[in-house]
Amino acid sequence: MNVRQLDISRRTIALAAALIGTVSLAIGAHAALNMRALDAAKAVATDQITGSVGQTSRLALVIGNGHYPDANAPLTQSINDARALSSSLRKKGFDVDMVEDASKDDMIRAVNRLKSRINRDTTVMLFFGGYGVQAGRESYMLPVDAVIWKESDVRRQGVSIEGVLDMMKQQGAKAKLVVVDASRRNPYERRFRSYSHGLAPIGTPDNALILSSASPGKVVDDGKGEHSTLVAELLNNLNAQGASAESAFNKTRIAISRASEGDQVPTVSSSLLEDIHFNEAGG
């Protein structure tokens, strides 16, 4: 091989090496772009999951119990109320977990689901429609599978309203809203009491608002409408433009008290530190 041929061979090898290097760089850059795109997609997916499951700022647990085997007739209004209230709250930005005709296990699971999602930015609402009984100066929501013959059965078979409120507080909820429509004559108390005692006063933890369908110790009738007296009036007030929770609850109390001429006086207890608006645009 002469000198000229050797020089050409060297230039050819150098050119090939440069070409291989360029191709390698292109492949590497393409792979890096793909990895960045994959990482971005993962981040978006994580944000979506976190936003819908872990970081929702408004949560509601709505329980409507209507079909109690021990009752003479179903509480159809409780089911209607739970459905209508769930629909209204969803329109107002709440992520609603609705449970109908819940057993004790169903109610405990629902409370635990709620517990797992509460954080310090969360406004939490609990609604219960059904039968409620007080025992030991504490109010209990009764599941449809409750078997009650004595007062101790209430504590064992029921779900404590104060217990759910305590859970909300321990989880650090920003605000706690509770609506209890359970001051009805029930088929259980006559087995161990001479008359129905209604519900006990519900303790109000910090930054909480509680609406109950009757005064402590009182029972009320449901009326004959599609919804209970309490929920029918509450739905009207929730839909008012710019309604705050405290305003809606108080207007509900006043309207029912006046319409019934004092026969039914709902109770509102508040320790709220700021206004909570049902319409998100209102605050």
Positions of predicted regions on the chain:
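Cysteine endopeptidase catalytic domains of the caspase/legumain-like
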Residues: 2-283
